[in-house]
From Swiss-Prot:
Top EC class for this record: transferase
Name by which UniProt lists this protein: Mycothiol acetyltransferase
Residues reported in the UniProt entry to bind acetyl-CoA 2: L202, G203, V204, H209, C210, K211, G212, L213, G214, K215
One matching Pfam family: Acetyltransf_1
Gene: mshD
Organism: Segniliparus rotundus (strain ATCC BAA-972 / CDC 1076 / CIP 108378 / DSM 44985 / JCM 13578)
Length: 265
């Protein structure tokens, strides 16, 4: 196996990859820089035919060295091979994301009930961006990936080809001030998954004390996904976020899988 090759990608992202004897890509690691005060994120993939030869561990060590102190290594598989790499490299878990899923036809989705004075409409374009950014950053000021966005990052995300403005729902108070939003997403069918909806981002302004707003916004988005003909929806939630877990369980979601972030001990 040749030495690892380094590649600089946009926005400070770096990529390390290894080639096999025929020059094909055997595996790679992606290093995404964290925002100020937050750790870098590392993900590693090795092609099945090149596993069990030490390449995964080599990529993990090289990527963590390059990413710097405190970098997170994400494990999306929790397989025996990935757990062996974790043990051999003295990595310890620091964060767990629960992927939860729900069938959209049953149990039936109830009608959303919004607090008095709250109205909901769909995203209408750039005129909504500043308010959307304000609520996002207030709701996720603690979050390594979702918080601390700039207007440029928000608009870059909104410009992605998968974004459907009709699937972004904005909740406003009696003063027409944005107090919460639900951004949904649809994932196309793959070889291993059917077409799938997602509660992509759900944010409520922490200054808003409207009880039940998050639940109502969730239901609006889920009913939209159902009406698009989707059979199932997923979401991701921090394992430590007990109130959110309770809300989603109350709406019929169950844990489908877990993604775990590790750091060097």
């Amino acid at each position: 196996m040749d030495d690892l090759v380094r590649e600089e990608l946009p926005n400070g992202t770096r990529r390390l990859f290894a080639r096999d004897a025929q020059g094909g890509e055997a595996g790679f690691a992606v290093i995404e820089p964290g925002r100020p005060g937050q750790p870098a994120m590392v993900e590693v993939q090795v092609r099945p035919e090149h596993r069990s030869c030490g390449l995964g561990g080599r990529l993990v060590r090289a990527a963590l060295d390059e990413a710097g102190p405190g970098a997170y290594l994400w494990d999306h598989e929790n397989s025996p091979a990935s757990q062996a790499i974790v043990r051999r490299n003295g990595l310890v878990p620091v964060r767990t994301l629960c992927q939860m899923r729900r069938w959209l036809a049953y149990p039936p989705l109830p009608e959303p009930v919004f607090p008095d004075g709250v109205s909901v409409r769909q995203y209408q374009g750039p005129q909504d961006d500043e308010e959307l950014l304000r609520v996002n950053n207030a709701a996720f000021d603690w979050h390594p990936e979702q918080g601390g966005w700039s207007i440029e990052k928000l608009r870059e995300r909104l410009a992605q080809p998968w974004v459907d403005p009709a699937g972004i729902f904005l909740a406003r108070d009696e003063q027409d001030r944005l107090i919460g939003f639900h951004w949904t997403r649809t994932h196309p069918q793959t070889q291993t998954e059917h077409k799938l909806g997602e509660v992509y981002v759900l944010g409520v302004d922490p200054a808003c004390h409207c009880k039940g707003l998050g639940k109502a916004l969730t239901l609006v988005g889920l009913r939209h996904l159902r009406d698009q003909g989707l059979a199932q929806a997923k979401l991701y939630v921090e394992q430590t976020n007990a109130p959110a877990l309770a809300t989603y369980r109350g709406l019929g979601f169950t844990v489908h899988a877990q993604d775990v972030a590790y750091v060097r001990g």
